[in-house]
C-alpha cells in the first residue's frame, strides 16, 4: 500500500513517476524498499492517468442495500407481521410442551467423547 501512496505523493507534487522517485519517497518514510515492487508499480502505472483514476474512485457511489419489494407491497404487508409473530410464538409454546415426554438428554454424550 505504501508504494501506491508514494505514487500518489509524486503525482500530487507533479514529479515524474520513476523507480528512483518511488524509492526516494519510500526511503524518506522509513520503508524497506523492494526494487522489484517499485519497478512493477512504475510499469503498471505507465499508461494510467492517476488524476482521472482518483476522480473516478471518489465519484463511485457506495452500493445500496437491495430493496425487498415495492412500496405498495410494503404497505400491504404492514398488518401481517404481528399475526405471523403471534403464530410463531404459539408454535414455539406447543413445541416447548413436547419436551416433557422425552428422556433426559446427556446419556449419549459418552459415545461422542469415547
Swiss-Prot record:
<keyword id="KW-0687">Ribonucleoprotein</keyword>
<dbReference type="InterPro" id="IPR027534">
    <property type="entry name" value="Ribosomal_P1/P2"/>
</dbReference>
<dbReference type="Pfam" id="PF00428">
    <property type="entry name" value="Ribosomal_60s"/>
</dbReference>
<comment type="subunit">
    <text>Part of the 50S ribosomal subunit. Homodimer, it forms part of the ribosomal stalk which helps the ribosome interact with GTP-bound translation factors. Forms a heptameric uL10/P0(P1)2(P1)2(P1)2 complex, where uL10/P0 forms an elongated spine to which the P1 dimers bind in a sequential fashion.</text>
</comment>
<keyword id="KW-0689">Ribosomal protein</keyword>
<dbReference type="InterPro" id="IPR022295">
    <property type="entry name" value="Ribosomal_P1_arc"/>
</dbReference>
<comment type="similarity">
    <text>Belongs to the eukaryotic ribosomal protein P1/P2 family.</text>
</comment>
<dbReference type="GO" id="GO:1990904">
    <property type="term" value="C:ribonucleoprotein complex"/>
</dbReference>
<protein>
    <recommendedName>
        <fullName>Large ribosomal subunit protein P1</fullName>
    </recommendedName>
</protein>
<dbReference type="InterPro" id="IPR038716">
    <property type="entry name" value="P1/P2_N_sf"/>
</dbReference>
<feature type="region of interest" description="Disordered">
    <location>
        <begin position="55"/>
        <end position="114"/>
    </location>
</feature>
<dbReference type="GO" id="GO:0005840">
    <property type="term" value="C:ribosome"/>
</dbReference>
<feature type="compositionally biased region" description="Acidic residues">
    <location>
        <begin position="70"/>
        <end position="105"/>
    </location>
</feature>
<feature type="compositionally biased region" description="Low complexity">
    <location>
        <begin position="56"/>
        <end position="69"/>
    </location>
</feature>
<dbReference type="GO" id="GO:0006414">
    <property type="term" value="P:translational elongation"/>
</dbReference>
<comment type="function">
    <text>Forms part of the ribosomal stalk, playing a central role in the interaction of the ribosome with GTP-bound translation factors.</text>
</comment>
<dbReference type="GO" id="GO:0003735">
    <property type="term" value="F:structural constituent of ribosome"/>
</dbReference>
